[in-house]
Amino acid sequence: MLTTGVDIIEIPRIKQVLDRYGQRFLDRVFTPSEIDYCNGRPPNLAARFAVKEATMKALGTGVRGVSWKDIEVVRADSGAPSVELYGRAKKRAERLRVCEISVSISHSREYAVAFVVAQLTDQPELKA
């Protein structure tokens, strides 16, 4: 079974929030490695923000269900985007029996979009 999440965000909106709140915004939403990778570039920050929201949707939690930093956007060795889950996001994925998460990101001058597919295993959850 598959679950999906998609999100689109206006890059100027992220720039406005970054201009207004600066490091406070970055520290609330992004991990240190995401902050380093994006280096303050609004298109990159917007794309990662969209991935986080799309992942929350694929997990069925919404933005109130997990912390922003429970979802970290990383790069595979191939350069493809992926996510690492922590905290409540990881627990939710385990409950759903997520065995794989695929991520696609794109952005233009004005918008960033992310599409996330979570593949669920058909195996019953093991009880300890």
Region spans (language model):
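Core catalytic alpha/beta fold that binds nucleotide/phospho-ligands
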Residues: 1-128
